[in-house]
Amino acid sequence: MYDMKALYEAHSVEEAVALRLEHPEAQIIAGGSDVLVQMREGKRAGAELISIYGIDAMRGICIDEDGNIRIGSLTSFSHITRDPIIRKYINVLGEAVDMVGGPQIRNIGTIGGNTCNGVTSADSASTLHAWEAVVELTGKNRSEEHTSELQSLCCI
């Protein structure tokens, strides 16, 4: 069904970064709702994949000590729609991601994948852009973490 060269599974951010450095051509996937469809269509035949689905530290929604709402990039659309923090403070984001596909897609699709995949149907990107979202990026080790405004990384 899927013509892939290899599938690597990361269970920590550090492991994901190490795998990416070791396999620079590999496509990073979380839920895989877009990438796996493209593979099934033959558009990414023979691809290497790095799954970050098992990194629990990248899931969830909370308010940090500075009052910022933090949404892990592996947080599913269905989780975002139901989350009390989102409902109270950014209900429009919950409404936007509730428009994504059907329930199956909302259960597996992630906000990180939706904003990073570069597809025109990125339902969450315009809302995050309007709310001046900031993304956290990391390099080879945690000391290389930095933040960047989403709008500086995307063409919306």
Residue ranges of predicted features:
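C-terminal structural segment of proteins
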Residues: 1-148
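Positively charged, low-complexity/disordered segments
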Residues: 146-156
